[in-house]
């Protein structure tokens, strides 16, 4: 979404349903409910009529996550979803993403350079560096014990 795009939060979120619409020019009641539910999950319902470009970075991330929820109900692929956010908003976003995974059963595949967060929230780690690793957190820490010693960075 371009930052200058003059769409409301609700319109941006509804655009996630376009893959379900086919050639219909309007959204169905079910799609509108799906968007409303996604706004509720992301705790942004009061922002529904606001212009996307006037939102803070954290609010914009929540809008885009709500839009993604309208597009899929099974898996989210997130690329650095907390990039540029302050620590408080980062913690809130990770908590929302974790809730989607635990309570809604949505598989979350997330690209992150924040190894501490990955180790806190992920069930499995794919590490691509000088060596490649895929496995559980426990197996990762056995393979890379220096992670905790270096404050969450593995070489």
Describe the role of every protein-language-model region.
Residues 112-113:
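H-loop/switch region of ABC-family ATPase nucleotide-binding domains
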